[in-house]
Every structure is written in structure tokens, then in C-alpha cells.
Swiss-Prot record:
Biased composition (Basic and acidic residues): 383-397, 443-466, 836-863
Name of the molecule in the record: Serine/threonine-protein kinase 10
Pfam families per UniProt: Pkinase (PF00069), PKK (PF12474)
PTM note: Autophosphorylates.
Gene3D superfamilies: Phosphorylase Kinase, domain 1, Transferase(Phosphotransferase) domain 1
């Protein structure tokens, strides 16, 4: 179900799927086999193999990184690496010679470095680097990092396996498979990616928390860890499982050198400065270039010596120094010393994708006289097997090497700063000599180098007598278990016969510790001597390395291989997690962009709708006003016409009345006597004419006044109607504006809620992916732990079977020796008859049988106890792992809860601020609308007042015919 949800999260729509695209630096039209010829294999990694290739035209060599891809989308995972290699041009960074995509395989052709990787060189030489060599490498790495960081590139996987050596004694940084190319200078990253042992604390924290991203200073931490790795072969905490080292890095103090006294103060100060857990105070590459440890480096001679030594012809010699005192039933033949030459080793060219595991070898070269063929370490080859989960592999603790200059050189006689402590044991037999005493005459000097990177057990180691000439590993390493609890032995310390007590004590001690017999101890006294001769700057240098050959050499290789496999599996998970994270981020960004586009479209549509409504309302208003004005004009004309017609009729009536009055005046005059008629007629008619004119003027004035009043009333009524309509339209318009703003506010609120829900869901998807990836990682860790526990149990079973098979031989050998010594003792102290002696011998034999039976029972009980302890330890390892995983899951869930809570709180705060800002917006809108309403009212009021103050416009009157006296006559 969870996987289905996970697939749903990462599922993209059909139109969202990215089509195959062309990449700038990758050629698709050319078969790389036509240009390059594969001449060998350099290594393999989590994502493919690395081959040595030769250009068919120029003959130039390249490291061909071949990666099989299932589909086109996987190409995107490698484009960052190709782009970085193509754009970087620096003498200490590998160059890209070409990239091809052909038949589902991606070929990345990288500059070939003959010196190989630094970690492979250390394994080849069985020692760490000297301080001068580390100084040169550090200087050149800082220059490369300064260049990368100036290009906004974070390497994110610095380690010795990704530092390649050239033939000229320079280094080149490689493997940008997990590097990040930023867009901004101050951009930070939150991807949990890299190799655990070299991870900076801030990168480790990103496994469960993305709130504390890191920047380019994570490379500075990895640089410091790499320097410790070069000094000690292994990085700090290499004895821990990769899953536990992350917790160690996050919670522990910054790591330091295991033996600080062997290194210069400047080196220690440089590491202290670089390994600062606070990235804010951690210096940059440019600042570290000014540090005294690297500022004075001017020559790369030390690296040229290193490359020449690693590539020199090797003369191997195997010595087999067996004790002369052979057991009677020893049936194994001695191995004869043999010599053979070995071609210069093919050191691994490239740490493919950075998955080289920490190796278990901890050998270092010291300056001293050339070892002779008879030089042997007095003792046994002890390799301490750490049975805890933190164990990395068996440690080879007895080895030594010498370096001799055939001709004097500038560095002759200088002590190596990083040489390990040395235990000097003098004398073939007897007690060890004190450090300031000369060895006994005829004895040979033995040197045993013991170097444990994780702790310095040999510092201030007290000089003590070695009983019977044997050095028990438990005395050298307190608290550590001897190899297999069964592989240490003791050598007879004297050829005298008075050894009953000491021999018995030795044998019982060895049986208690599970050690092997005298004969078996001699099987481990094989010494492999490697002599390398090379010339640097005209100086011939001879380096001889000696180490004890152990049965567990294959076991070391197997442990290294298994650890490499574990890191590869972790790297694959990281890569897949990174890809899934990128896909999810891309999907989330696409969702967010789509949502924002939809929001914008919705907002635009709403605004457009209301703008259209406003336009329609204004247009409708304009049309209505125009129609009203037209109607008013028409009404005015019609009303004026009607009034004029009525006035004309009234005027006609009035004129008729005047005519009638005129007739009445004439009739009155005619009633007068004839002699008075003429004068009276004239007076009466003049008077009537005056009255008629006055009456007509008054009548016309009244008609005019009535007409003007009627027109004025009509105009006022029209204005009132238009004003009402304007008010109505303004109210509608303002209501529409209110609706528009309210809709916009509701839409804003809904969009913010929707955006919050999307971001919240995306955050849940993000943590779901993190939980999914964390559970996958935990499942892989449990699988690795189960394999580890199974290996420990199988090794214990094999060791116990070997002990069980050896015990009868030990008992037979011991029984014969004790019987011979007892008979010799009876012969020396002869008392009693032969029968008594035979009876004593019989009793002694019976006691021996009882003792041997008790030993076998003791061994069985010890094996059962060991198995119980081992099973308990395995269960403890599993429980501890489960507890760590539960803590991580709990931390992730707790962080998710806090993140969701913080997201909700921020959203609520944002909405509160938005609502607080909404009130002023509403008030501003209402103020604006009220202001427009007041302006309109003021406009109408002023218009009315203006109409009242200004005289009425002249009215076009009817063409009244003025009444005149001529007409009346």
C-alpha cells in the first residue's frame, strides 16, 4: 500500500512527461567504439564499470566510465557530472574527453591518470602517506576546491579514492557523480548524499531534517577527513558500520589523528581548523591556502617519489622460519623460501562513483636498515578481530618495512613523521631486551610494527619481560581479543628438560585463550618481503617492506569486498533517493506553477467579468440617458406644440372677444346722436385701441409666461428623471464594484487556503518519500547487519571446528612431551623398583587421560559459551540497530509534526494579517464610493442652482399675428 502511494506521489500526467531531449555535451550519433578502443578494465562501481580506453587516432588514454541506463530519464542523473567536467578547466581536476550515448549505454570518457587513486596506492604500498606527501596533496586539493567553489560547485564526495595521481606527481579530483552545481553563490543544499565516513555533520543532519541546508564548506570537512585517511590509511570511525558512523559524526567531537605526537603541530592545527563542526566558522579553501601547513609547498617531489614507488617493479620474497624443535608427529613439510618478480601493479585508476570501502590494512613504512632474509618477528602473526558491530575487519598488526637510499639524496636519513610505534624484541629465545640494551651476541634484531588507527595502545607501553619468549597479543592490546581466540601460540624458551611447570603453564594459557599448538604457530612464521627500486630525480631509492603472511589475508580481502558492497548498496540507495527527490520536487513545482496559473486565470476571469458588467452598465446607462434625453426633447417639443396650439386657440378666442368688444363699442357709439357719433367714435375707438393693445400685450405676455413655465417644469422634470436614473445607475455601479471587490477578496482567501493545502500536502508527500526512503535504507541496513552477524557466527563456527580438530593433536603432542619429561624425571630421580615406576607411569597416563578429557569438556563448554556470547552480541547488535532506526523514524515523524504545525501557524498568522489589511481596504472602497456619490449630488445641486439663476432659454414661439388697429378697421 505504501509503495502504491509512493508511486502515486511521483506519478505525472501524460502531458507532463518529459520528452527525450538533446544534451549539449553528449553525442548520440556516434558509436564510441569507432573512436575509442577498450584496452583493459580499471575497476567497477555501483553504476557500472571503468575501462582503460585508447583513442584510435591520437593514441591518447582515457578512463571510460560505462553506465547502462534503462530509459532516457536516467540520463538526467549524470548530466550534472558531465556538465561540471566539461565546464571545469583546472590542472587539478580531471578533464572530460567526450560523452556518448549509444545503445542504452552512457560512455563518459575522462582523462586517464596513470598513478591511480591515492587509496589504492596506500593499499599497494601497505602504508599511509608521509607528511610531505600529504602537504602536496592538500595544497593541490585546496587549489582545486577553491576553483570549484568559485564556479558554485560543491563536490560532496571528497575522499582518497577520488584523488587521482598523475605520472608527473600531481593530483586530480575525480568523480563528480554526486556533485551539485548551484545557480546562486550563497545557495545551499539539503540532499543527504555522499559517503558516510567523509560526510560533514551538517550533511548528516539532512538525513532526517531539511531545515539546516549546507553549502560548499561541507567539502572542507571532507578534505580534513581525507587528510586523516591519507595519514592512517583509514578514515576516522572506519571500524564502525556505515549506518552507525553517521550518528558518531553528528554527536561526537571532531576526529583527530590517532597518534598526534607523530605529526607536526602545523598538520594538527590544520586539521583542527578544517574539522570545525560549525560551518559558519569553518574556513574556506582560500583561507586554508594561507595556512602554514600548505602555504610553503613549492615542489611535488614527494608525490613523484610516491608514484614512482607505487609503479616500481616489485621483488617479492617469502621466508619460512620454522623452529628447529619439530614435534614427532609433525607431518607438514616446510615451505621453501621463494623469490619471484611481480610486474608493476595495476593500481586502480578511478574510484567508480566513490564506493571504495575503508580497508583493513594498517601498515606503514619506516626508515631503517634493509631487512635480511632471516629477519623475523619473534612471536606470532596476530590480527585482532573486533566482534562488535563497530568492527571493520581483522587488523594485521605485525609487519615492518625498511627504506634504503642507494645513492645519497636530499631526503636521506630523514625520519618519516607518520611512522608507527615499534616494539623491539631481542634474542631468539629468552626474555626480551630492554630498549636501551644491546642484543645478545649471536641474536638477531626483530622489529614488529603495530599500528592501530583507531587507538594508540602502544604509547607509553612499559618494557617487560616476555615469559618463555612469547608475546601475547592480549598484553599489547588490553581488552582486545586475540585472533580467532585460537591463533596465538608459544615457543619453547629453552632446550633444557626442566620445563614441566613452564610448558604446562604455557600450554594451559594458550588453551584458555584458544591458541594453537607449537607446530601451528610455526605455520604463521612466513614473512613476505617486497623490495621496490626506483629512481627519482637521479636518486635511486630502494624500499623493502616485510610483513607476516597470515591465514586471514583472504579474510581481509573478503571484509574489504563486503564493505565495498555495503557502500555500493548505500550509494545506489542514495542515488535512487536523489532521483526520486528530484522527481518529487519537479512534480511539486509543476503543481505549484499550475495552481498559480489557475489562480491568475481565475482572478483575471473574475475581474474581466465584473469589468464587463461595469462596462455594460455604463453603456446601458449612457443609452438610457440618451434615450431619456431624446424622449424629453420629443416630449418638450410635443408639449410646446400643444401649448402653442392651445395658446393660438386662446389667442383666436381673445381676438374674437376683442372684435366683439369693438363691435359693442361701435354699437354704443351708433346709439348716440349723429352729431356726437363722429367725435365719440374717434374717442371711443382710440380708447379701445389702446385698451386692445394693452390687453393683447398682457395676453401674449401671459401666454409666453405660461409657455416658459410649462417648458421650465418639463425641463425640471426631465432633469429630475435623469438625476434619478444617474443615482440609480451609480448605486448599481457601486454595488457592482462592491461585489467585484468582495469576490476578489473571497477568491484571494480561497486561493490562499488552497495554496496552503497544496503546500501542506506537498510537505506530507515530501516526508512520506523521506520515510519511504528511510525505511528502504533501514531494510538494507538490517539485511547488512544480518549478513554481518551470520558471517561472525560462521567464522566462530569455523574457528571452533579448527580448534576442535587441533585439540587432539595438541593433546597427543603435549601428552608425549609430558610423558617423556615425566619418564626423564623418574630416571633422574629414580627411586623404587621398575614395577613401581611402571605403576607411576600408568597412574600418570590415567591422570593425563582425565586431564585431556577435562580439557575437551572445557573446550566444549568454552565453545558453547562463545556461541552464546556471539548470539547475544548479534542480538545486541540487531537491537541496537533497531533502536537507532526507531530513533531516526521518531525524529523524522516528530520533525514532520513540527513542520506541519509551524506551517499551519504561519498560515493562520498570514490569514490574520490579510484580514487585518482587508478592513482598511473595505473602508477605503466605501470612502471612495461615498465620495463619488457626494460629487454626483454636488454636481446635480450645482446644476439645479445654475438653472435657477440663469434665465430660461428662449422658446421658439408661434408666429402670433400682432393685433393692430389697421386689422380692426
Amino acid at each position: 500500500m505504501a509503495f502504491a502511494n509512493f508511486r502515486r506521489i511521483l506519478r505525472l500526467s501524460t502531458f507532463e512527461k518529459r520528452r527525450s531531449k538533446e544534451y549539449e555535451h553528449v553525442r548520440r550519433d556516434l558509436d564510441p567504439g569507432e573512436v575509442w578502443e577498450v584496452v583493459g578494465e580499471l575497476g567497477d562501481g555501483a553504476f557500472g564499470k571503468v575501462y582503460k580506453a585508447k583513442n584510435k587516432e591520437t593514441g591518447a588514454l582515457a578512463a571510460a566510465k560505462v553506465i547502462e541506463t534503462k530509459n532516457e530519464d536516467e540520463l538526467e542523473d549524470y548530466m550534472v557530472e558531465i556538465e561540471i567536467l566539461a565546464t571545469c578547466d583546472h590542472p587539478h581536476i580531471v578533464k572530460l574527453l567526450g560523452a556518448f550515448y549509444w545503445e542504452g549505454k552512457l560512455w563518459i570518457m575522462i582523462e586517464f591518470c596513470p598513478g591511480g587513486a591515492v587509496d589504492a596506492t596506500m593499499l599497494e604500498l601497505d602504508r599511509g602517506l608521509t607528511e610531505p606527501q600529504i602537504q602536496v596533496i592538500c595544497r593541490q586539493m585546496l587549489e582545486a576546491l577553491h576553483y570549484l567553489h568559485s564556479k558554485k560547485i560543491i563536490h560532496r564526495d571528497l575522499k582518497a579514492g577520488n584523488v587521482l595521481l598523475t605520472q608527473d606527481g600531481d593530483i586530480k579530483l575525480a568523480d563528480f557523480g554526486v556533485s551539485a552545481k548551484n545557480v546562486k553563490t550563497l545557495q545551499k543544499r539539503d540532499s543527504f548524499i555522499g559517503t558516510p565516513y567523509w560526510m560533514a555533520p551538517e550533511v548528516v543532519m539532512c538525513e532526517t531534517m531539511k531545515d539546516t541546508p549546507y553549502d560548499y564548506k561541507a567539502d572542507i570537512w571532507s578534505l580534513g577527513i581525507t587528510l586523516i585517511e591519507m595519514a592512517q590509511i583509514e578514515p576516522p570511525h572506519h571500524e564502525l558500520n556505515p549506518m552507525r558512523v553517521l550518528l558518531k559524526i553528528a554527536k561526537s567531537d571532531p576526529p583527530t589523528l590517532s597518534c598526534p605526537s607523530k605529526w607536526s603541530l602545523e598538520f594538527r592545527d590544520f586539521l583542527k581548523t578544517a574539522l570545525d563542526k560549525n560551518p559558519e566558522t569553518r574556513p574556506s579553501a582560500a583561507q586554508l591556502l594561507e595556512h602554514p601547513f600548505v602555504s610553503k609547498v613549492t615542489s611535488n617531489r614527494a608525490l613523484r617519489e610516491l608514484v614512482a614507488e607505487a609503479k616500481a617493479e616489485v621483488l617479492e620474497e617469502i621466508e619460512d622460519s620454522r623452529d628447529e624443535a619439530e614435534d614427532d608427529d609433525s607431518s607438514e613439510s616446510a615451505s621453501l623460501p621463494g623469490k619471484h618478480k611481480r610486474d608493476p601493479s595495476e593500481v586502480s585508476q578511478l574510484s567508480f562513483d566513490g564506493d571504495k570501502p575503508p580497508d583493513s590494512s594498517s601498515l606503514k613504512t619506516t626508515n631503517g636498515p634493509v631487512a635480511t632474509e632471516k629477519e623475523m618477528v619473534n612471536g606470532q602473526s596476530d590480527k585482532v578481530l573486533d566482534e562488535r558491530i563497530s568492527s571493520d575487519s581483522d587488523k594485521l598488526v605485525n609487519s615492518h618495512s625498511t627504506k634504503t637510499l642507494a645513492s645519497s639524496g636530499p631526503d636521506e636519513g630523514k625520519a618519516t613523521p607518520g611512522k608507527p610505534d615499534i616494539i623491539s624484541l631481542s634474542g631468539r629465545r629468552g626474555s626480551s631486551a630492554e630498549g636501551d640494551k644491546q642484543p645478545m651476541p649471536g641474536s638477531k634484531e626483530r622489529r614488529s610494527m603495530v599500528d592501530r588507527p583507531e587507538s594508540s595502545h602502544l604509547e607509553n607501553f612499559p618494557e617487560e619481560k616476555l615469559a618463555n619468549g612469547s608475546l601475547d597479543s592480549s598484553a599489547v592490546f588490553p581488552g582486545s581479543r586475540s585472533k580467532g581466540d585460537s591463533d596465538s601460540g608459544s615457543t619453547s624458551a629453552s632446550e633444557s628438560m626442566d620445563l614441566t611447570i613452564s610448558l604446562s603453564a604455557d600450554l594451559s594459557l594458550n588453551r584458555e585463550s584458544g591458541s594453537i599448538s607449537l607446530k601451528d604457530s610455526r605455520m604463521h612464521n612466513k614473512t613476505l618481503k617486497r623490495t621496490r627500486k626506483f629512481v627519482v630525480d637521479g636518486v635511486e631509492v630502494s624500499v623493502t617492506t616485510s610483513k607476516i603472511i597470515s591465514e586471514d589475508e583472504k579474510k581481509d580481502e573478503e571484509m574489504r569486498f563486503l564493505r565495498r558492497q555495503e557502500l555500493r548498496e548505500l550509494r545506489l540507495l542514495q542515488k535512487e533517493e536523489h532521483r526520486n527527490q528530484a522527481q518529487l520536487n519537479s512534480k511539486h513545482q509543476l503543481q505549484l506553477d499550475q495552481m498559480l496559473r489557475r489562480f491568475e486565470q481565475e482572478m483575471t476571469a473574475k475581474k474581466k467579468f465584473y469589468d464587463t458588467e461595469l462596462e455594460n452598465l455604463e453603456r446601458q446607462q449612457k443609452q438610457q440617458i440618451e434615450k431619456m434625453e431624446q424622449d424629453h426633447s420629443l416630449r418638450r417639443r410635443e408639449e410646446a406644440k400643444r401649448i402653442r396650439l392651445e395658446q393660438e386657440r386662446d389667442h383666436v378666442k381673445f381676438m374674437e372677444q376683442l372684435k366683439q368688444k369693438k363691435k359693442e363699442v361701435k354699437n354704443e357709439v351708433e346709439k348716440l346722436p349723429r352729431q356726437q357719433r363722429k367725435e365719440n367714435m374717434k374717442v371711443k375707438m382710440d380708447d379701445f385701441a389702446q385698451r386692445k393693445q394693452t390687453m393683447e400685450q398682457d395676453f401674449l405676455a401671459k401666454q409666453k409666461e405660461d409657455l416658459e413655465l410649462a417648458m421650465k417644469n418639463i425641463t425640471a422634470q426631465n432633469k429630475k428623471e435623469i438625476c434619478d436614473k444617474e443615482r440609480e445607475c451609480l448605486n448599481k455601479k457601486q454595488q457592482l464594484m462592491r461585489d467585484r471587490e468582495a469576490c476578489i477578496w473571497d477568491l484571494e482567501e480561497r486561493q490562499q487556503q488552497e495554496k496552503h493545502q497544496l503546500i501542506k500536502q506537498q510537505l506530507k508527500d515530501q516526508y512520506f518519500l523521506q520515510r519511504h526512503e528511510l525505511l528502504r535504507k533501514h531494510e538494507k541496513e538490517r539485511e547488512q547487519m544480518q549478513r554481518y552477524n551470520q558471517r561472525m557466527i560462521e567464522q566462530l563456527k569455523i574457528r571452533q571446528q579448527q580448534e576442535k580438530a587441533r585439540l587432539p593433536k595438541i593433546q597427543r603432542s603435549e601428552g608425549k612431551t609430558r610423558m617423556a619429561m615425566y619418564k626423564k624425571s623418574l630416571h633422574i630421580h629414580s627411586s623404587g623398583s621398575a614395577a613401581e615406576q611402571r605403576e607411576k607411569i600408568k597412574q600418570f597416563s590415567q591422570q593425563e587421560e582425565k586431564r585431556q578429557k577435562a580439557e575437551r569438556l572445557h573446550q566444549q563448554q568454552k565453545h558453547e559459551t562463545q556461541m552464546k556470547d556471539m548470539l547475544a552480541q548479534c542480538e545486541s547488535n540487531t537491537n541496537e540497530l533497531q533502536q537507532l532506526q526507531n530513533e531516526k523514524c521518531h525524529l523524522l515523524i516528530e520533525h514532520e509534526t513540527q513542520k506541519l504545525k509551524s506551517l499551519d501557524e504561519n498560515h493562520n498568522l498570514h490569514m490574520k494579517e490579510w484580514r487585518d489589511k482587508l478592513r482598511p481596504r473595505k473602508k477605503a472602497l466605501e470612502d471612495e464610493l461615498n465620495q463619488k456619490k457626494r460629487e454626483q449630488e454636488m454636481f446635480f445641486k450645482l446644476s439645479v442652482e445654475a438653472d435657477e439663476q440663469t434665465p430660461a432659454s428662449p422658446v421658439k414661439h408661434t408666429k402670433f399675428i400682432p393685433f393692430s388697429s389697421t386689422e380692426s378697421s
